[in-house]
Swiss-Prot record:
Its cofactor is Mg(2+). Its EC number is 2.7.7.8. It is an enzyme of class 2 (transferase). This is Polyribonucleotide nucleotidyltransferase. HAMAP family: PNPase. Mg(2+) binds at residues 490, 496. The keyword Hydrolase does not apply.
């Protein structure tokens, strides 16, 4: 890597983009400092000196949000950053996906990409700056990488597409799209949308790709200027004679028939047995520990299985479970299967099954998101769990990993556009999707199960959502798009393209690929095929439950809304929160107060809500001119008496208004503690209340 500082500048969506090399982190294989507006990200790429054993490419992408970047001190006892939050994890996955396919096949060195956000301007996306930084760090390093790539955000406002919309623009945008790719094709898409059409989504993707091409050209100019020397990487060549011998044995022992097994577990068992039989042919009795040969045979067998699966799909249009390319697995769904929960939905598609369970809470049960931007109160959450038993395996039980966080967030993104506004449904909603069985497309099963749970719970959603995962097998001169992919097709195919939406349009998409990129033709066809599949699944779901229930569960909390004048909020809260805590302690309710004076009262028992409402009404009650009250004498002065109309509100009863008869002293007719009926005659501009008993005598 060059040790001399170099600075390169361009413009990106109306803001300055600067890439600096040669000054920071010089012991990394590659490092760049990206400045986008006031956002600053340090991106580094480091590779191990020796390759790792195994069949996978050990790439790790990290994205770290430093709280000082936004002028904040971390919360908690230690006052320092802990493990990455969900948003940071999702960004790391977002960067990983377009980069991973562009390393040479067979490259097994550990590669670690680190992105540190040093300064954060919410209007200049740190996430997209980190994606460009990751691409540049790899491109200027000696690590073999077939980039560069770039990524952009795309918004859609009033029929117009916008590159890298600001925070304010995102609030009104119908689309929140992240798209990445290289000069020739798109290789990553992720989006949340408010029911936009397939054509609108397609146009958005390739509108973004036009900007990506310009950014890739800019990066290539930097690479050409720096001229990094890349590591020499020579892939390991297979022994062709050995490959032919193994291939002959697979044909002899019926690889095609073994692959074409409907049941996943039976297929896996049959493949394991076939591999074991073939490997036994190569075990030398005099050298039973010939591990290198055995390892090579297993690697060849795995490649031959992959080739056979792809050949069957591409040439014979037959999938491992016997389906046609556009055929969906058998569907089954139920609702209301858990009696004490607030809502539940069980969705099964072939050998993939998700149980989604919904819980309603008060608005105060929101999740507080404290990241680099302003604090956010999230009142809809979707969490995804993938236990080992879902794939018939054992293993340690750990906290949710990157995959679980990513799938949960995708489901949340797909559903959040149909969640009713607070004014219409004043609840916090949490859905947990438990994957009970998995053979591919479990994230989309969780979306379908969650829609069923929402309707079972009586949440007045705007429209039901269904999800489906599309696959792809490419040949040199042809391709086959698959509807509703299973696990083997995901692992051995070229694409996992998830699409969720209503009958009217798309609410979320996510695309991962293992090839260099996708053409417009493939993406357009995949979107249309996904639409047809989504509608088929939707029709099945609506046969189970066609609209939200009209009543909530008996075990769900009840929430009542009332409104007070904003200047009365302080009276309800009291000094140091004393009054509101007294209400909560006495009634057991949950209270949430908005700045406009809206109060949400939540509890399981309606009587508790009624009591809390009575207390608040008493606190915020106001005197009205012309109304009569049974008042209590609280203080006596020479000129009259101060009487309490109700808690928190006193009035002056002037000596001349006590009686129609002349009174020399107030004490002659009133003493502290007496009750007297009064009528309100005046409330002045300062809110002072004047009362009269005399008016009632006349």
């Amino acid at each position: 890597m060059s040790q001399e500082k170099k600075v390169f500048k361009t413009e990106w969506a109306g803001r300055s983009l600067t890439i600096e090399t040669g000054q920071l982190a010089k012991q990394a294989n590659g490092a760049v400092l990206v400045r986008y507006g006031d956002t600053v990200v340090l991106s580094t790429a480091t590779a191990s000196k020796e390759p790792r054993d195994g069949d996978f490419f050990p790439l790790t992408v990290n994205y770290e949000e430093k709280m000082y970047a936004a002028g904040k001190i971390p919360g908690g006892f230690k006052k320092r950053e802990g493990r990455p939050g969900d948003d940071a994890t999702l960004t790391a996955r977002l960067i990983d996906r377009p980069i991973r396919p562009l390393f040479p096949k067979g490259y097994k060195h550990d590669v670690q990409i680190m992105n540190m956000v040093l300064s954060a301007d919410p209007d200049c996306s740190p996430q997209m700056a980190a994606m460009i930084g990751s691409s540049m760090a790899l491109s200027v390093s000696d690590i073999p990488f077939q980039g560069p790539i770039a990524g952009v955000n795309v918004g859609y406002i009033d029929g117009k597409y916008i590159i890298n919309p600001t925070v304010e623009e995102k609030e009104v945008s119908r689309l929140d799209l992240e798209v990445a790719g290289h000069k020739d094709a798109v290789n990553m898409v992720e989006a949340g949308a408010s029911e936009i059409t397939e054509q609108e989504m397609l146009e958005a993707i390739f509108f973004g790709h036009e900007e990506i091409q310009r950014l890739v050209d800019f990066q290539q100019q930097i690479v050409d200027h720096i001229q990094p020397v890349k590591q020499e990487f020579i892939p390991v060549e297979r022994d062709e004679a050995l490959v032919e011998r193994v291939k002959s044995l697979t044909e002899e022992k019926g690889l095609k028939e073994t692959v074409l097994t409907f049941d996943k577990q039976q297929r896996d068992e049959n493949l394991d047995n076939l591999k074991e039989e073939i490997v036994n042919e190569f075990i030398d009795e005099e050298d039973p520990e010939n591990e290198l040969l055995i390892k090579e045979v297993y690697a060849i067998l795995n490649e031959l299985v992959k080739e056979e699966v792809r050949r069957l799909i591409a040439d014979e249009k037959i999938r491992p479970d016997g389906r046609k390319p556009d055929e969906i697995r058998p569907l089954d769904s139920e609702v209301g299967i858990l009696p004490r929960t607030h809502g539940s939905g069980l969705f099964t598609r072939g050998q993939t099954q998700a149980l989604s369970v919904l819980t309603l809470g008060a608005l105060g049960d929101y999740q507080l998101i404290d990241g680099l931007g302003p604090e956010e109160e999230k009142r809809f959450m979707h969490h995804y769990n993938f236990p080992n038993f879902s794939v018939g395996e054992t293993g340690p039980v750990r906290a949710p990993g990157r995959r679980e966080i990513g799938h949960g967030a995708l489901g949340e993104r797909a559903l959040k556009y149909i969640i009713p506004d607070t004014a219409d449904f004043p609840y916090t909603i949490r859905i947990v999707s438990e994957v009970l069985e998995s053979n591919g497309s479990s994230s989309q099963a969780s979306i379908c199960g969650s829609t069923l749970a929402l309707m079972d719970a009586g949440v007045p959603i705007k429209a039901p959502v269904a999800g489906i995962a599309m696959g792809l097998v490419t040949r040199e001169d042809s391709y086959t798009i698959l509807t509703d992919i299973q696990g083997m097709e995901d692992a051995l195919g070229d694409m996992d393209f998830k699409v969720a939406g209503t009958k009217e349009g798309i609410t979320a998409i996510q695309m991962d690929i293992k090839i260099d990129g996708l053409t417009r033709e493939i993406i357009e066809e995949a979107l249309e095929q996904a639409r047809r599949g989504r509608l088929e699944i939707m029709n099945h779901m609506l046969q189970t439950i066609d609209q939200p229930r009209t009543e909530l569960s008996a075990y769900a909390p009840k929430v009542v809304t009332m409104t007070i004048k904003p200047d009365k909020i302080r009276d309800v809260i009291g000094p140091g929160g004393k009054k509101i805590n007294e209400i909560i302690d006495e009634t057991g309710v949950k209270l949430d107060i908005e700045q406009d004076g809206t109060i949400f009262i939540g509890a399981v028992d309606q009587a508790m809500i009624n009591r809390a409402r009575e207390i608040i009404e008493e606190i915020t009650r106001e005197a009205e001119v012309g109304q009569t009250y049974q008042a209590t004498v609280k203080r006596i002065e020479k000129y009259g008496a101060f009487v309490g109309l109700f808690p928190g509100k006193d009035a002056l009863l002037h000596i001349s208004q006590i009686s129609k008869n002349r009174i020399e002293k107030v004490e002659d007719v009133l003493k502290i503690g007496d009750t007297i009926e009064v009528k309100i005659t005046e409330i002045d501009k300062q809110g002072r209340v004047n009362a009269s008993h005399r008016a009632l005598e006349e």
